[in-house]
Amino acid sequence: MRNTFGNLFTLTTFGESHGPAIGGVVDGMPAGVDIDMEFIQSEINRRRPGQSKITTARNEPDQVEFLSGVFEGRTTGSPIAIIFRNGNTRSSDYEALKAVPRPGHADYVAGVKWNGFNDPRGGGHFSGRITLPVVAAGTIARKMTGMDFRAELVEIGGETDREKWNGLLDRTSREGDSIGGIVECTVSGVPAGLGEPFFDSAESLLSHALFSIPGVRGVEFGDGFA
């Protein structure tokens, strides 16, 4: 089992959805880089569910805690360990999944892969909460790049008119269904020649990272499939 992404700058994730905590270890960060705790927490809060009717009802504070690698507001050069404690868990809701896994989730394949020793509660290590350390690591990495990153939700269920989104989401919720959407991301300040010619091209590596997010079903670059 491998849970590490990256080469020069790496992130290793750990923990399960209903365990004591989930987190990550960031390695490759140079010493002396200023760590803006308020900015990191603000980015974490953007990801935090339970703030509206269109996200999961699970409400966690998602308070970031640094265990190592930061001293007096700056990186020390050693690995940066980050955790988020779990609190709002109802493990009894997942008892039935031991016999009847959820369609489209990792319940069945995780059980097969690890001979039933996996933690199925809340999706275990396959939970969407594992994206928490990814967001934290990405926020730290931005300090190294000098690039500007922007993201915007532009479509929900094929609908681009924002005024119709709430009605569409209400109807979908009443029907007990779910729908997809499109998030548009823009990066400026990217240096020319970034990436390798073939397997490690910028698009290849970005796609690798993006498809690690459980809900991502497709990635387009530039004009996409136009």
Outline where the language-model segments fall.
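Solvent-exposed alpha-helices and their adjacent loops that cap or buttress functional pockets
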Residues: 1-6, 15-18, 58, 72-76, ...
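N-terminal, positively charged regions that mediate nucleic acid binding
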Residues: 1-58
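Conserved phosphate/anionic-ligand binding catalytic regions in large, soluble enzymes, centered on
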Residues: 9-30, 129-141, 199, 211-214, ...
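Short beta-strand elements
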Residues: 10-15, 22-27, 80-82, 110, ...
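Glycine-rich anion/phosphate-binding loop at the beta-strand->alpha-helix junction
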Residues: 14-20, 175-226
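Glycine-rich, N-terminal phosphate-binding loop and its surrounding beta-alpha-beta segment
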Residues: 43-103, 107-109
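Structural signal for hydrophobic packing residues in well-ordered secondary-structure cores
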Residues: 44-52, 84, 88-90, 112, ...
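Glycine-rich, mobile lid/loop segments that gate access to catalytic sites or pores
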Residues: 112-198
